[in-house]
Amino acid sequence: HYSYTEHYYIGDIFVYTSPDEEKGVLLELKGKGCRQFESYLLAQERSWYDFLMDALVDGGVMKRLDLAINDHTGMLDIPELTEKCRNEECVSVFRSFKSYASGELVKHEEQDKAGMGYTLYIGSLKSEVYFCVYEKSYEQYIKLGIPIEEAPIKNRFEIRLKNERAYYAVRDLLTYYDAERTAFSIINRYVRFVDKEADKKRSDWKLSVRWAWFIGENREPLKLTTKPEPYTL
């Protein structure tokens, strides 16, 4: 895996090693792995900020970082956002978007085969930064059998960063200790959703009300949350 020769794991926390010292040691944490890793951070009285700082001080290299924003109220309507992309009501430096009624068509990119419901990718999956917005409630229904209307998280907006982009996001997190600032400054740099106004230039179209709410207008600030979970054998 990743051309490493050995790997060790406990729960969903994976460590890859190689006799080639140039490659170093790779720590891989997916969603569940992050929750389990937080149990160790909690026991050590450390935060994610402490861990990331220690990793950088020791010469760590960030290969990938995902920042996820959970929508608990359904403010993100993914079919509506997809329609806005088609109607040129998505103002973005990205040149591409893709939408799927389920995760089937991109299962080589996703761990979860068909369990993502409506999914919208903004940006190229090959680039160092792109966004993935999907119906988390549908995923929870497929995986855990939780009825869609009872799911605590309706949608998830993921910022996926690789290499240099991941490094600069970590640097921003460690400069401001404000995950909301870091996440939304990235989103606002790359994309905004607007409402078409026939008598105005596209650059002057107003932000969509729902999108304005999502990015911070008239809502409570967000914080970097931790939800430590023990691993199960």
Label each PLM-derived region with a short phrase.
Residues 1-231:
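Structured, helix-rich domain cores that form ligand/interaction pockets
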